[in-house]
Amino acid sequence: MKIFRILFLPIITVTLISSCKKDKSNDPIPKASNTPVIELVSVTPTTVHALQDSIVFTIKYTDGDGDLGFAEADSMVVFLTDNRFPIVNPFHVQPLSPLGTTISITGNLEIILNNTILKDNASTSESAVFEIKLRDRANNYSNVLTTPAITVLP
């Protein structure tokens, strides 16, 4: 019986000590930045006819404090610029999390650009590249995405 205690007690002690190690897999997810971060998911189609087809840009967003979107329809969130023109196309987005909360959010946004035009009406085709950025309610601007070229046909 004494041998059993001598062998059993150290085994139990080692087991208890090793089970007290912090399990890093249960650590909370690191907090995302309060500045929005965006990634390009897709752009479709890659060829459009001027004044006929729409272009759909799908972007993934992450925002650490969840303040993307405005209740007021005249406050813009998404800014889309065609490299052929010095014009910014702004888009409104409703709040993506409840107002007054501070939660980390992530998701996808679809931005639809209707009726792309040709810069030169005599052109047989043009290549358009777009830049996209977001603005949150704290006036933080995201990184800027640059899309692959889209062919615009007459």
Describe the role of every protein-language-model region.
Residues 31-154:
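First exposed extracellular module after export/assembly in secreted or surface-exposed proteins
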Residues 1-20:
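Sec-dependent bacterial lipoprotein signal peptides
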Residues 14-38:
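Bacterial Sec-dependent N-terminal signal peptides
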Residues 7, 23-24, 86:
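Small/flexible residues
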